[in-house]
A protein has these predicted regions:
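Beta-strand elements within well-structured catalytic alpha/beta cores of enzymes
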Residues: 2-5, 9, 26-31, 61-62, ...
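Non-transmembrane alpha-helical segments in soluble domains
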Residues: 9, 13, 17, 87-91, ...
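Short beta-strand-to-coil "C-cap" segments at the C-terminal boundary of structured domains/repeats
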Residues: 65-67, 160, 350-354
Length: 354
């Protein structure tokens, strides 16, 4: 993976050079989480890996190159920064008017990147956590962070300057720091908690996305959603095999809902297997998992208080329902059931307003 990233970043920069775009392109390289839980690789002595509340799980590189803006390398930024700072920074760099009525969680770090600042940077506090559960749990896998301190899970305090590997819990030695970080987290949680029930909804019937395409990756479930093709191909059982979508019906009217085991472009029957995908040199690709054949006899659809069911014709590629929906937010669940009672979620659904 490292070699692949290196090669492709090089290709991208070569294109920018050849097109004469390098000078005034803001080029950013970063990652979405800490070191992978796969092969053991260099982790700079940090504790934890991907998904961890310790720095090894969420501290990531962030490189910016922009010659026209004076960013050509050779400068390290010491104060703590985070992903919430990216948008405010780009707004300032590009001289874009900040949208009215929007309060950003982050702040522009342009002055830190350029070194052109005549005032001290504030000792700010940031929070990250790794919930990975349906209903968030206070303090779960959390880190309350300053440039010096890490309060993990509300109990462990680490001086990241003296102990970057987070080996020595010094919470008992610094009660005032623990209290300060705890108070910040409590206020942060109180602000967010009322929004937990308002999960993002997928719009149905919007002119810009009609039909709407729903996949199992967006299921809300108590298990782990099928987030890669291997999960779908294996037709996992248990909590991870069913779920529901939060949806928002944009306009009242008649809708067609088509349920599929495989995506429309695969053009396969619901009860058909799927051949393994082409391998990827040097890696185990999710698509190489053979697609398991299931044999459901009925398809069920629930949207809000409306429930309906249909028999699945032999070798059908999809099951279609025509229903009338009222505008507003609701939930949608679609399943396939076999004769033996085993239930599978409909991994793909296509919703069209007529």
């Amino acid at each position: 993976m490292i070699a692949n990233i290196d090669t492709n970043v090089g290709k991208l920069r070569t294109v920018l050079d050849s097109e004469g775009l390098t000078e005034d392109t803001i080029f950013i390289f970063t990652t979405d989480n800490g070191t992978s839980s796969g092969d053991g690789v260099f982790n700079a002595g940090m504790r934890g890996k991907k998904g961890s509340e310790y720095d090894g799980g969420h501290r990531v590189p962030f490189f910016v190159h922009w010659p026209a803006g004076g960013l050509t390398g050779g400068r390290d930024v010491e104060p703590i920064t985070a992903y919430v700072d990216v948008l405010p920074t780009l707004i300032e760099m590009c001289h874009i008017e900040s949208p009215a009525g929007v309060t950003f969680d982050g702040r522009s770090i342009q002055s830190l990147l350029t070194g052109n600042t005549d005032k001290a940077w504030p000792d700010r506090i940031l929070v990250t956590d790794s919930q990975r559960v349906k209903d968030p749990i206070k303090w779960r896998k959390s880190a309350v962070m300053t440039s010096r301190w890490r309060l993990n899970n509300g109990k462990e305090l680490y001086d990241i300057k003296a102990d970057p590997g987070q080996e020595r819990n010094v919470a008992q030695d610094h009660p005032a720091t623990v209290a300060r970080l705890t108070d910040f987290y409590d206020a942060w949680w109180a602000e967010l908690e009322p929004t937990f029930a308002n999960a993002t909804a997928i719009y149905l019937g919007h002119p810009a996305d009609n039909p709407a395409r729903l996949t199992s990756h967006d299921w809300i479930t108590t298990g782990s959603t099928p987030w890669n093709q291997s999960h779908i191909r294996r037709a996992m059982t248990g909590k991870s095999n069913t779920g529901f979508w939060n949806v928002k019906v944009v306009e009242s009217g008649e809708y067609e809902v088509r349920l599929r085991r495989w995506p429309e472009e695969a053009d396969l029957a619901i009860n058909a297997p799927l051949a393994p995908g082409a391998p990827v040199p040097g890696a185990q690709a999710f698509r190489t998992t053979p697609g398991k054949a299931i044999d459901p006899t009925t398809a069920s659809l629930r949207i809000g208080n409306l429930s309906t069911k249909k028999d699945i014709p032999a070798d059908a590629k999809e099951v279609a329902f025509t229903i009338k929906l009222e505008a507003g937010k609701t939930t949608m669940e679609a399943t396939f059931e076999q004769a033996d009672g085993e239930i599978f979620g409909a991994y793909y659904a296509y919703v069209t307003k007529k």
